[in-house]
Amino acid sequence: MKTKLDFVKMKENGEPIVMLTAYDYPQAKLAEQAGVDMILVGDSLGMVVLGLDSTVGVTVSDMIHHTKAVKRGAKNTFIVTDMPFMSYHLSKEDTLKNAAAIIQESGADALKLEGGDGVFESIRALTLGGIPVVSHLGLTPQSVGVLGGYKVQGKDEQSAKKLIEDSIKCEQAGAMMLVLECVPAELTAKIKEEVSIPVIGIGAGSKADGQVLVYHDVVGHGVDRTPKFVKQYAKIDGTIESALSGYVRDVKERVFPEEKHSFQINQTVLQGLYGGK
């Protein structure tokens, strides 16, 4: 399994880091077999798995439950788990308690925290406590209400400078890696030069040290539409629906199960069940 130092070396050597989300055992198993470098158990599971309207309703217990499943499916892959909405904002004590629960109970290798202002101290506290932290700046879904919707961040000079400053502060606070979401490609390239930690992009251009996408977006499963920055490599929903429809049809028409799908009983035993008749 790759470690924090391996990811730094990959950045130094110019080798792209591949991160993908996963939320259960089979997804994680396939991701590891495909050769991803890191798996993110994102709070995006609220929308793509649990059917919620946003990530806000996801709990610490949800993250622990899904990370456990992912860990079983990808024992040799570095796993990052999101700290969900308001689990690291109330107090330092609550932050450490929630983080410890996720790490100890789920087996995650690192935790991801969204935001800059108000979060630097949490990054520092977790790092000092021995928990690796991945920072997330730009479009931060947990704060989408404050940001005014799902919009590209850092498009004007003031907000661009703020993103650069916050990226540097995240590293100074101890973050091992930085995720930039929906940020102009040129700004991503600038931030990449300003920090020594790997920068992972999602809708942040090709100059980042690596990329992350949501599993369901990549394979075309359960999503009605995908963001501009997504490249969809398959559309498995059609295949799945066809298989399920075939099953329904065969049962209704009594085509399934066939004899080869059934178990047989010895005729003598069968006669005994009917009173020897």
Curated annotation (Swiss-Prot):
Taxonomy-wise, where does this protein's organism fall, top ranks first?
Bacteria, Bacillati, Bacillota, Bacilli, Bacillales
Sorted alphabetically, the keyword list is: Cytoplasm, Magnesium, Metal-binding, Pantothenate biosynthesis, Transferase
According to its UniProt record, in which pathway does this protein act?
Answer: Cofactor biosynthesis; (R)-pantothenate biosynthesis; (R)-pantoate from 3-methyl-2-oxobutanoate: step 1/2
Q: Which organism is it from?
A: Bacillus velezensis (strain DSM 23117 / BGSC 10A6 / LMG 26770 / FZB42) (Bacillus amyloliquefaciens subsp. plantarum)
Q: How is the cofactor bound?
A: Binds 1 Mg(2+) ion per subunit.
The cofactors required by this protein are: Mg(2+)
GO biological process terms, alphabetically, are:
pantothenate biosynthetic process
Enzyme group, top EC level?
transferase
GO CC, any one term: cytoplasm
The UniProt annotation places 3-methyl-2-oxobutanoate binding at: D43, S44, D82, K112
List GO molecular-function terms, semicolon-separated.
Answer: 3-methyl-2-oxobutanoate hydroxymethyltransferase activity; magnesium ion binding
Q: What is this protein called?
A: 3-methyl-2-oxobutanoate hydroxymethyltransferase
The record's subcellular location field reads: Cytoplasm
**Gene assigned in the entry:** panB
**Catalysis performed (reactions):** 3-methyl-2-oxobutanoate + (6R)-5,10-methylene-5,6,7,8-tetrahydrofolate + H2O = 2-dehydropantoate + (6S)-5,6,7,8-tetrahydrofolate
